[in-house]
């Protein structure tokens, strides 16, 4: 029997529903920091400078923040293929498997055009077309996120986007992580720019001498990237405003404590602002989860990050029944929802709001992060109430098609004119009458 261990801090645990709802609301507001106004001011300065000075401003900010001057801004195309060929075989195989599965799933997302004939022979429809250029932001520097490359580039390529551009910050040596370059090669990305931060978002939104102006920007980033995306929305499309990651685990007495602990830590290791929540009907699991977490935290390479996340944004809730668990989950609308219960399919049917649902003990969130197939770019901070995962449609737009004939216009003219006149739009009505006079 393993020795019982305890966390260096108490993991917040509540057993009252009203208190649980208040705690979950607190977690959804964790990005609302006092620093946000200061950061927004700095972001606005960066956006204005890049809009006015182009590459020169991008290079100045990169030199200031990242310690090198990106001249040229673009990574030479041959370096992407070189990076792919230089990968260890096991990593190359893993990326190919992920790429294949993600591609197969997203191919099924391609929307179909709609065509219908009205009562008088008029032709009506909706036509889908890809955007021309997509800009993908991939966090970088000391870390490598090839999964972010695949999860953004694959749907863009499946959509049929003509030009896919990645911006990813380089290290102080001026080099983008080779695994990111390799994934970009595999996914068919056209260009990689070795720039990051708000200046990269500005470059893609406004265009510079080196960076083409794009139609849609997708991909996660820090608060500078998120606020920059928010500021340029309307001039370009964006996927979403990503906040810190989160997981909510609903577990009953059948759940294994060590698996639950591992899944909570898998979220906590992302970021000190990441949120890990356990809602359970098992008092035994609730009482023992701290010990299971403490045991796995020993010698954890990201222990400080995990502890900060769990201390500030971790939560355990004990409920009387799974119906209450589902209701509390819906009030939180988690990015990731794991159902570690005896009948996960039945519980999933009760869930209304979640970015992604992982059913049963063999579906850890990690498989969704890397290669299950559905996209891992998901709404956070309760945005799952009104939005969903990044998809092929993120990189497409639809156009309405209307072709009336004389009979259709004859049959509907009086109603059109009546409605136009009721709104005081005389010329609208006249545009119909002139065709029939």
Curated annotation (Swiss-Prot):
Ligand binding (Zn(2+)): 267, 270, 369, 428
Cofactor: Zn(2+)
Residues binding substrate: 245, 267, 270, 336, 369, 423, 428
Keywords: Amino-acid biosynthesis, Histidine biosynthesis, Metal-binding, NAD, Oxidoreductase, Zinc
Active site residues of this protein: 335 (proton acceptor), 336 (proton acceptor)
E.C. number: 1.1.1.23
Enzyme class of the recorded protein, top EC level: oxidoreductase
Co-factor binding comment: Binds 1 zinc ion per subunit.
Any one annotated GO CC term: cytosol
Pathway assigned to this chain's UniProt record: Amino-acid biosynthesis; L-histidine biosynthesis; L-histidine from 5-phospho-alpha-D-ribose 1-diphosphate: step 9/9
Pfam family, one: Histidinol_dh
Recorded superkingdom: Bacteria
GO molecular function terms attached to this record: histidinol dehydrogenase activity; NAD binding; zinc ion binding
GO biological process entries: L-histidine biosynthetic process
Binding site for NAD(+): 137, 199, 222
Catalyzed reaction equations: L-histidinol + 2 NAD(+) + H2O = L-histidine + 2 NADH + 3 H(+)
HAMAP family with a match to the protein in the record: HisD
PANTHER family: HISTIDINE BIOSYNTHESIS TRIFUNCTIONAL PROTEIN (PTHR21256:SF2), HISTIDINOL DEHYDROGENASE HDH (PTHR21256)
Family according to the record: Belongs to the histidinol dehydrogenase family.
Known role: Catalyzes the sequential NAD-dependent oxidations of L-histidinol to L-histidinaldehyde and then to L-histidine.
Name of the molecule in the record: Histidinol dehydrogenase
Originating organism: Parasynechococcus marenigrum (strain WH8102)
Lineage: Bacteria, Bacillati, Cyanobacteriota, Cyanophyceae, Synechococcales
């Amino acid at each position: 029997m393993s020795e019982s261990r305890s966390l260096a801090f108490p993991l917040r645990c509540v057993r009252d529903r009203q208190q649980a709802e208040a705690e979950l609301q607190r977690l959804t507001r964790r990005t609302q920091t006092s620093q946000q106004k200061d950061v927004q001011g700095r972001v606005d300065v960066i956006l204005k400078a890049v809009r006015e000075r182009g590459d020169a401003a991008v290079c100045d900010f990169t030199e200031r923040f990242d310690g090198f001057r990106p001249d040229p801004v673009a990574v030479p195309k041959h370096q992407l293929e070189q990076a792919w060929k230089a990968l260890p075989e096991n990593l190359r195989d893993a990326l190919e498997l992920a790429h294949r599965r993600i591609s197969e799933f997203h191919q099924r997302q391609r929307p179909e055009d709609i065509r219908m004939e009205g009562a008088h022979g008029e032709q009506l429809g909706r036509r889908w077309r890809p955007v021309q250029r997509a800009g993908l932001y991939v966090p970088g520097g000391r870390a490598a996120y090839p999964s972010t490359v695949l999860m953004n580039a694959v749907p863009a390529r499946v959509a049929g986007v003509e030009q896919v551009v990645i911006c990813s910050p380089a290290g102080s040596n001026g080099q983008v992580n080779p695994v990111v370059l390799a994934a970009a090669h595999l996914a068919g990305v056209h260009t990689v720019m070795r720039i990051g931060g708000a200046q990269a978002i500005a470059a893609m939104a406004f265009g510079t001498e080196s960076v083409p102006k794009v139609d849609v920007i997708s991909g996660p980033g820090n608060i500078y990237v998120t606020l920059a995306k928010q500021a340029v929305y309307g001039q370009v499309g964006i996927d979403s405003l990503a906040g810190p990651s989160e997981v909510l685990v609903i577990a009953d007495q059948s759940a294994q404590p060590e698996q639950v602990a591992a899944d909570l830590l898998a979220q906590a290791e992302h970021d000190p602002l990441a949120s890990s929540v356990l809602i359970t009907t098992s008092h035994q699991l609730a009482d023992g989860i701290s010990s299971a977490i403490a045991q796995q935290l020993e010698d954890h390479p990201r222990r400080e990050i995990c502890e900060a996340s769990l201390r500030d944004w971790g939560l355990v809730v004990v409920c009387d029944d799974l119906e209450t668990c589902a209701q509390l989950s819906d009030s939180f609308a988690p990015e990731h929802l794991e159902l570690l219960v005896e009948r996960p399919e039945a519980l999933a049917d009760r869930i209304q709001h979640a970015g992604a649902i992982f059913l049963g003990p063999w579906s850890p969130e990690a498989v969704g992060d890397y290669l299950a197939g559905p996209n891992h770019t998901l709404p956070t901070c309760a945005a799952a109430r009104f939005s969903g995962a990044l998809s092929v449609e993120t990189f497409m737009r639809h156009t309405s098609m209307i072709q009336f004939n004389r009979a259709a216009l004859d049959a509907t003219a009086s109603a059109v004119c009546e409605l136009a006149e009721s709104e005081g739009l005389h010329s609208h009505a006249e545009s119909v009458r002139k065709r029939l006079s």
